[in-house]
Amino acid sequence: NGKYLCMQKGKTKFEYTSYKWEFPGGKIEPGETPQQALARELLEEMEYPVEVGEKLVTVNHEYPDFSITMTAYLCTPKAEADGFRRREHADSKWCSPVELKNLDWAAADVGVVESIL
């Protein structure tokens, strides 16, 4: 539908990531592909079944206390998806590309936003 699911973190142990916006996802477990990990994370954390589609971009970012390599993919909800549950985030919203510019993004996610714009 041309919109992107954006999730707002709650308070984290690092001030620079607290209450920032991010795209949903998570860590890859041993034996998983990045696509399998993304589908699993969305199902576990949000009860949201998705089909993982094309790769958008891979971003490497160095925070003061850790580094992250993040690969973003376009996803579409599976037919049985009836919305999602927000379990680990303070807020969520669906945003058009123009609306993405208005959010206070986690630094690592800025590269993903730029690839969309």
Stretches found by the model and what they are:
Residues 8, 56-59:
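Short hydrophobic alpha-helix segments
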Residues 21-27:
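Short glycine-enriched, charge-decorated loop/helix-capping segments at active-site entrances
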Residues 27-51, 59-113:
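Unchanged
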Residues 1-21:
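N-terminal strand-loop-strand
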Residues 8, 24, 74:
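Residue-level detector of conserved, well-ordered beta-strand and adjacent loop positions
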